[in-house]
Amino acid sequence: MKKISSVFTMFALIAAILFSGFIPQQAYAETPLTQTATNETATIQLTSDVHTLAVINTFDGVADYLIRYKRLPDNYITKSQASALGWVASKGNLAEVAPGKSIGGDVFSNREGRLPSASGRTWREADINYVSGFRNADRLVYSSDWLIYKTTDHYATFTRIR
């Protein structure tokens, strides 16, 4: 009789959890919540913004992120944003003025014509493998139609990766 009571209690507990609307926190990992105040009430709205907490700065990591979200990860800032924070390229001080950030999102002109051109296509670049000090030669260059190339010799040669 005691065993039947324990089993019944366990089923009741499981049913209560299942029907209470309990959803693990992880289910909302890619849909952050924002709080919006209205006149006398506060409401919670789901937003489609995705914010990355980790630093993503490898060729494959950034390429995969670009394909999935159609933008650079949050650890990237443009040269003008970095300058506004006090970055001076000749000082190699990006890690000091913007810890955890890398330069990315600026237009790449493709002046030498080493990348394929097409009507309306624009190119942008992103530093890869940056940790601190002066920027290295590794860059990811991506187009407005999502062609993605890498260069490890500061634009001398390119290899398509996506």
Curated annotation (Swiss-Prot):
A GO term for molecular function: RNA binding
One Pfam family it belongs to: Ribonuclease
Where is it mostly found?
Answer: secreted
Q: Which SUPFAM superfamilies match?
A: Microbial ribonucleases
Signal sequence: where?
1-29
Spell out the catalytic residues.
125 (proton acceptor), 154 (proton donor)
**A GO cellular component entry from the record:** extracellular region
Q: Which InterPro entries match?
A: Barnase, N1-like, Ribonuclease/ribotoxin
* Keyword annotations of the record: Endonuclease, Hydrolase, Nuclease, Secreted, Signal
Q: What is its EC number?
A: 3.1.27.-
Fetch the CDD domains from UniProt.
barnase
Q: Where in the cell is it found?
A: Secreted
Q: Does the keyword Hydrolase apply?
A: yes
Propeptide residue range(s): 30-53
Disulfide bond entries: none
Record's function text? This is a purine-specific ribonuclease.
> What family does the entry list?
Belongs to the ribonuclease N1/T1 family.
Protein name per Swiss-Prot or TrEMBL: Ribonuclease
